[in-house]
Structure formats: structure tokens, C-alpha cells
From Swiss-Prot:
Transmembrane segments: none
Organism: Mus musculus (Mouse)
Keyword presence, Signal: yes
Record's compositionally biased regions (Pro residues): 90-101
Cross-referenced InterPro entries: C6orf15
Cysteines engaged in disulfide bonds, as pairs: none
UniProt biased composition (Polar residues): 39-52
Protein's name according to its UniProt entry: Uncharacterized protein C6orf15 homolog
Compartment annotation: Secreted, Extracellular space, Extracellular matrix
Keyword set, alphabetical order: Extracellular matrix, Secreted, Signal
Single Gene Ontology MF annotation: fibronectin binding
Gene name of the record: Stg
Signal peptide: 1-26
Length: 349
């Protein structure tokens, strides 16, 4: 019996311990909560468990504040407060985050650089469709870049020191809005010229498409022009090559080949030249075909073989010895050695 009674008491003891443990934990946690609670008007958890103990009276000021807070949350959107809550001070609630003015101020130049980077990052995706054609950005984008939002966010005493930076930033923004493609090229190639490159700007002195520099270049107009050395008018009026040289007063080839030149085809080979075809072979030349072989020449065909010459035409004529005179009349000429006269017996007289 005793063992049976001892075995039945053990579960009952465990059950009582399990029922008492929550109360003990609630009492141990309720004591510090009651000490640290800012609202002393609300009854604590332990006081609710012990109704026999005297409860403290609620504070009327705290109750009034607690009544105002729900009314603030239910107030209209225009910010009008009820008449009973006029004594509540204006400003942020005490449970909100600390105001921005309480934070330590940062360096204004770092903030300016960060804002500029943010603006460029916002503008780059909008400018991508305009890069290939160099068009203008929409008016909203350009107006957003031109807003002087940076100067208004800084104190007045630092305004004078930040004006040059803001003006340069505005200039770059205007250049980017005007021609995004060339602005990015200028940024990617910092060694290029200081001015922003534009496709519509003239590369020369006389407008777009008239030249490749601000000064006259040697190619291609001037050298090929009126007084140049190579083709164009160089091949024209006064250049050394090649038209006038091939013209009337040049060395090669027209006048040289003309009337008074030394070489063919006209003057050299003309009336008073030393070489063929006309003067050299003409009336007063020393070589054929006309003069040397003509009336007063020493060689055939005419003078040499003519009336008073020895060979071969005059030789066959009346006063020559060979061969015409030898075969002529009156027998005054001797026959060749071993020759016989016609009709004779072969005896020489």
C-alpha cells in the first residue's frame, strides 16, 4: 500500500510543479518590468495576478497623453488637430528617428561629386540612343542637367568657393546635352584638343568640308593649283612639269620637236637642220637623198655620174676616158688591155 501510494504521489508532485513554474516566472519578470515601465498608470502583470494588493492610482497627465495619441493617428490629412490637443507641441514624435540636422555634416565637395556622378549615371542610359546620330537630348533631360540644385544645398558661406566647380559642371552638362557622342569621345581620349569635337564644325578656314585644318595645307588644292609643281596647273601655265614643258617654249617635246629645235620631228628634221628628213637630206645638206646625190655633189646618182665627172656616167660620155670615151667615136681613146676593135683582124695599129 505504501509503495502504491508513493507511486501515485510522484505524478501529482510533477503536475503541481508544472503548474507553479509559470507563476514563478511571471513574478520574476514582472518585478523589473514594473520598475522600468514609463507608464505608471497602467497596472502591471503581477498586480493583476494579486488582486488583494492595493493598486496605485493612474496619473491623470499620462492618461491625457495616451488619449491624445490615438486622436493624432485619427486626425485628417490636412494636419488640422482637434481643439483639445492644441497643447501638444508641434514637431516630430518622440518615438521617431533622430532628425537629419543632428547628424554630423559631411564634406560639401564630396557631396557635390557624388551628386554629379548620380546625375551622369541617370543621363547615360537616356543618351545611349542618341550616341550614333549625335542628336539633341529631350528637353526634360537637358533641363534636369541645367538645374542649379547643387548650389542651393550648400551653406551661404561656402558658396563663393564652389562657384567655379559648379560652372564647369554646368558647361560639361551643356556639352553633353548638345552632343553626347563627342562628349564621351572627349572624356575617353583626354589627350585630345581642349574643345569639344562636333561633327558639324568646320575643320578648315572656309566652312564645313573646305579643308582639314585652319591653315592652308599643301594637299590637295594648292599643289595641284595654278603655281604648283605637280598636276593641275602644274601641268599648265608656268610649272616645270609637264604641259608647258611639252608646249611652245619648253624643252620637251613640242617646240623641241618643232621648227627651231635641235631634235625631231619638225625643226630638227626641217629646212636648216643637220639631220633628216628635210634639211639634212634637202638642197644644201651633205648627205642624201637630195644634195649629196644632186647636181653638185661628189657622189651618185646625178653629179658623180654626170657630164664632166670620171665615174661612171661621164666616163661613158664624149670627153671621158672610161668607159664611154673608150668606146666613143674617132678612135681617140685606147681600148682596154687585150680588147679588139670591131671588124679588125686583131692587129693593133
Amino acid at each position: 500500500m505504501q509503495s502504491h501510494a508513493g507511486g501515485s504521489r510522484a505524478p501529482l508532485g510533477l503536475l503541481l510543479i508544472c503548474l507553479c513554474l509559470p507563476g514563478l516566472f511571471a513574478r520574476s519578470t514582472g518585478a523589473p518590468e514594473e520598475k522600468a515601465s514609463p507608464h505608471s498608470g497602467q497596472p502591471s502583470f503581477t498586480s493583476l495576478l494579486n488582486p488583494g494588493q492595493p493598486q496605485p492610482k493612474p496619473d491623470p497627465v499620462n492618461n491625457e497623453l495616451l488619449g491624445v495619441l490615438p486622436r493624432l493617428s485619427e486626425s485628417p490629412q490636412d494636419g488640422a488637430l482637434p481643439e483639445g490637443g492644441s497643447e501638444v507641441p508641434n514637431g516630430p514624435p518622440f518615438w521617431g528617428p533622430p532628425p537629419m540636422e543632428s547628424w554630423p555634416s559631411e564634406d560639401p565637395q564630396q557631396g557635390m561629386a557624388a551628386v554629379a556622378e548620380d546625375q551622369l549615371e541617370q543621363m547615360l542610359p537616356e543618351a545611349l540612343p542618341y550616341l550614333s546620330r549625335g542628336g539633341r537630348l529631350p528637353e526634360a533631360s537637358s533641363a534636369r542637367l541645367r538645374q542649379p540644385s547643387l548650389a542651393a544645398s550648400y551653406p551661404q558661406d561656402s558658396e563663393a568657393g564652389l562657384q567655379p566647380g559648379s560652372s564647369s559642371l554646368e558647361t560639361e552638362a551643356e556639352a553633353f546635352a548638345r552632343s553626347p557622342f563627342w562628349f564621351l569621345i572627349h572624356k575617353l581620349l583626354p589627350g585630345s584638343s581642349g574643345r569639344i569635337l562636333r561633327p558639324g564644325t568646320s575643320w578648315g578656314s572656309g566652312g564645313a568640308g573646305t579643308g582639314w585644318g585652319t591653315r592652308p595645307m599643301p594637299y590637295p588644292s594648292g599643289i595641284w593649283g595654278s603655281n604648283g609643281l605637280v598636276s593641275g596647273t602644274s601641268l599648265g601655265g608656268r610649272g616645270p612639269y609637264p604641259v608647258r614643258i611639252w608646249g611652245r617654249n619648253g624643252w620637251y617635246p613640242l617646240r623641241i620637236l618643232g621648227g627651231n629645235g635641235r631634235y625631231p620631228p619638225v625643226g630638227t628634221w626641217g629646212g636648216y637642220g643637220q639631220y633628216p628628213p628635210v634639211g639634212t637630206w634637202g638642197g644644201y645638206g651633205q648627205y642624201p637623198p637630195v644634195g649629196p646625190w644632186g647636181g653638185y655633189g661628189q657622189y651618185p646618182p646625178v653629179g658623180t655620174w654626170g657630164a664632166n665627172c670620171q665615174y661612171p656616167a661621164g666616163s661613158r660620155r664624149p670627153n671621158c676616158r672610161y668607159p664611154a670615151g673608150s668606146w666613143g667615136t674617132k678612135g681617140q681613146n685606147r681600148l682596154p688591155p687585150g680588147a679588139k676593135r670591131p671588124g679588125s683582124s686583131g692587129i693593133t695599129p
